[in-house]
Swiss-Prot record:
Residues 607-693 are annotated as: GED. Its EC number is 3.6.5.5. This is Bacterial dynamin-like protein. It is a peripheral membrane protein. Dynamin-related GTPase probably involved in membrane remodeling. Lipid and nucleotide-binding are thought to induce a large intramolecular rearrangement, leading to assembly on lipid bilayers and possible membrane curving. In the presence of the non-hydrolyzable GTP analog GMP-PNP self-assembles on a lipid bilayer; this does not stimulate subsequent GTPase activity. Does not bind lipids in the presence of GDP; perhaps GTP hydrolysis disrupts membrane-binding. Residues 1-521, 575-693 are cytoplasmic. It comes from the Bacteria. Residues 66-313 form the Dynamin-type G domain. Residues 76-83 are annotated as: G1 motif. Belongs to the TRAFAC class dynamin-like GTPase superfamily. Dynamin/Fzo/YdjA family. Mitofusin subfamily. It comes from Nostoc punctiforme (strain ATCC 29133 / PCC 73102). SUPFAM superfamilies: P-loop containing nucleoside triphosphate hydrolases. Residues 522-574 dip into the membrane without crossing it.
Length: 693
């Protein structure tokens, strides 16, 4: 049963990562407690070392590790077998997967000791708990009804935000959280919700169907929301077993092979560009041919069943490698970096404090006064970096908002060619028939919305790349400013103690000696549970992609569509009516439609460009403002802590007699305790690396 090994290995590796997370979380918590206890003891001895920032950061990191999960977002159009796939993955017939029903709400599947479903609403109502049968009955709809709702731009359950399904399953218990999206469509509310998860998941499982290879809707979604955004996507071609069933002679091996190869060529042609990382082709590690129904049937009969021939073993191996090796190692490396910083800060503070215990108050004040110029230099570095961020902010906000303005104003230049692919099938008699005119108008409105959505997505991708490039440049500047900052803090230590103190002994060749604020600014530290997917600096504690999302869902996709489509329908209708009942040339009718649409569109583009470019400006500005606020706060905290560390010692010397020997021992014990916790974290990380090597 060799292929069962993939499932077992996945569970075992998840368990191993969960154990390491737990070990590191405990060590971080003890590290925070150790430093905090020492700070409290400092009040009755030589004074606090002002390590509040380290205590706060490692406490947050410890909590994040405790709550750590790998979040998988399942995307796919209706009737692609998403629920069947998920049931096969978890090994239970949990989610509705009958022939007809479609899950109609976004569902978050996570571990819970008891089986329960909680519905969360968006209108202020309190969450509602349901049993599974009622959930399946109430929140699944027929595909025909789903299609009708989509055409009418309506949601099946407009008051529902999402559902949380808790279930005592091994896969979930070991740290997997699954988000099941209702389907691919262009409703703004749905996309806003789904895109929020797209930006905050570890991997996307994009479910397709062998019998419907790469539909227009799927290609549009990938082009608009996935392409070029640094996301990790696993493409799951479901119902591969039905390729054989579609043949006239299912036993014809040659015909089956030819049919499968044709399908593979189609999928490769459409998906290859999404399976390249830094120039390397990883198509075989990202695209999988699955037979979910076969896997589910086997696992329901025997959870340990051999899944050979279903495609699941290969998929599980790739997902396992990505999550428990690539992503887990990256996450835990940041934790190790944070622990090293806390250890170094403690050792630096102890190394400064011990020599100063020997000095009387006057000598101590004299030495503190002597380093005032250096502290002014630290403030100068802060001001210079802050100025660079603000200049970058202003340049990017102006440039990107202007690019949006130009982009919108130029839509009319290419509209006639661009709109052809969106134009609905034009039956003039349908339009002239009052009974069918509403359906025609709805189809036309949907065509405009798709056109505007695609155009907006294309521009947004360009804007994101520009912003990302700007943050990369700021990251390089942070490294340079950090190096200068370190030189000055070393000078402060030398002038205070009279010694050249080397304290960066826990830093290896793979890391630089940048101060904590610079590491944060460079994206080397993450204290945020969001922004898990893609882009350099995605690990940074601020979340610029979600800032953009929050603004851009308010913007012109909604604003442009509202401004344009509602106004266009009237003039277009008059133009078509003017052709007369006897006019049967559909081609000319189409040309008239596009011509009139362009004429009306161009009328409104200046207003849209003017109004929405300000929204774009504000969005980009807020991205850099949030970054600047956090960077400035962290630099200020560092400068203030260094000053207060010295002021605390002066205050204590002025008010009490300090027992130098006991204080020396206390500080040395603190240093040893901190190093001991760091060593445990280093060992846990190294052991995990050794296991995977």
């Amino acid at each position: 049963m060799v292929n069962q090994v993939a499932t077992d290995r996945f569970i075992q590796d998840l368990e191993r990562v969960a154990q390491v997370r737990s070990e590191m979380s405990v060590c971080l918590n003890k590290l925070a407690e150790t430093i905090n206890k020492a700070e409290l003891a400092g009040d009755s001895s030589s004074g606090k070392l002002s390590l509040e920032r380290d205590i706060e950061d490692i406490t947050i990191a410890s909590k994040n590790l405790q709550q750590g999960v790998f979040r998988l977002l399942v995307l796919g159009d209706m009737k692609r077998g998403k629920s069947t796939f998920l049931n096969a993955l978890i090994g239970e017939n949990l989610l509705p997967s009958d022939v007809n029903p479609c899950t109609a709400v976004l569902t978050v599947l996570r571990y819970g000791p008891e089986k329960k479903v909680t519905i969360h609403f968006n209108d202020g109502k309190s969450p509602q708990q349901l049993d599974f049968q009622n959930f399946k009955y109430k929140y699944t709809i027929d595909p025909a009804e789903a299609k009708k709702l989509e055409q009418e731009k309506k949601q099946a359950f407009p008051d529902v935000d999402y559902a949380v399904v808790e279930y005592p399953l091994t896969l979930l218990q070991k740290g997997i959280e699954i988000v099941d999206s209702p389907g691919l469509n262009d409703t703004e509310a749905r996309n806003e919700l789904s895109l929020g998860y797209v930006n905050n998941c570890h991997a996307i499982l994009f479910v397709m169907r062998a019998s419907q290879p790469c539909t227009l809707g799927e290609r549009r979604y990938l082009e608009n929301y996935i392409k070029g955004r640094g996301l990790t996507v696993f493409f799951l071609v479901n119902a591969w077993d039905q390729v054989r069933e579609s043949l006239i002679d299912p036993d014809d091996v040659e015909e089956l092979q030819a049919s499968e190869n044709r399908l593979r060529q189609v999928f490769n042609a459409n998906l290859a560009e999404y399976c390249t990382v830094e120039g390397q082709n990883i198509y075989d590690e990202r695209v999988f041919e699955l037979s979910s129904i076969q896997a589910l049937r086997r696992r329901l009969k025997n959870p340990q069943a051999d899944l050979d021939g279903t495609g699941f073993p290969k998929f599980m191996d790739s997902l396992n490698t990505f999550l428990t090796r690539e992503r887990a190692i990256a996450e835990l490396r940041q934790v190790r970096t944070l622990a090293r910083l806390a250890c170094n800060h403690t050792r630096e503070a102890v190394a400064r404090r011990i020599p100063l215990l020997e000095q009387d108050v006057n000598e101590l004040k004299k030495r503190i006064d002597s380093v005032e110029p250096e502290f002014n230099k630290l403030t100068g570095i802060r001001d210079e970096f802050q100025k660079e961020i603000i200049n970058t902010r202003d340049t990017q906000a102006r440039t990107i908002s202007e690019s949006f303005r130009s982009y919108v104003l130029n839509l009319g230049n290419t509209f006639e060619n661009d709109f052809l692919r969106y134009q609905p099938e034009l039956n003039l008699f349908d339009f002239l028939s009052s009974g069918k005119r509403e359906a025609f108008n709805a189809a036309l409105q949907k065509a405009f919305e798709q056109y505007i959505t695609d155009k907006s997505a294309a521009w947004t991708l360009t804007a994101e790349k520009d912003i990302n490039a700007a943050f990369k440049e700021l990251s390089r500047s942070a490294s340079q400013y950090g190096a200068s900052y370190n030189q000055i803090t070393d000078q402060i230590t030398e002038k205070l103690t009279g010694k050249d103190v080397k304290v960066h002994t826990t830093t290896t060749a793979e890391e630089d000696n940048s101060p904590g604020w610079a590491k944060w600014a460079m994206g080397l530290l993450s204290l945020s549970k969001g922004n898990l997917a893609g882009f350099a600096l995605a690990g940074a504690g601020f979340d610029w992609k979600n800032i953009l999302l929050n603004y851009f869902t308010v913007i012109g996709i909604g604003g442009i569509i509202t401004a344009v489509t509602g106004i266009l329908l009237g003039p277009i209708g008059f133009a078509l009516l003017g052709l007369g009942v006897g006019f049967l040339q559909a081609d000319q009718a189409r040309r008239e439609l596009v011509k009139t649409a362009k004429k009306e569109l161009v009328k409104h583009l200046p207003q849209v460009a003017h109004e929405q470019s300000q929204v774009v400006y504000n969005a980009v500005k807020e991205c850099f403002d949030s970054y600047e606020r956090e960077v400035s706060k962290r630099i200020n905290d560092d400068i203030v802590s260094r000053k207060s560390e010295l002021d605390n010692l002066v205050k204590q010397k002025q008010t009490r007699e300090i027992n130098r020997e006991s204080e020396f021992n206390r500080l040395k014990n603190l240093q040893e305790d901190v190093i001991a916790q760091l060593q445990k974290i280093e060992a846990a990380y190294s052991n995990l690396l050794a296991y995977y090597s």
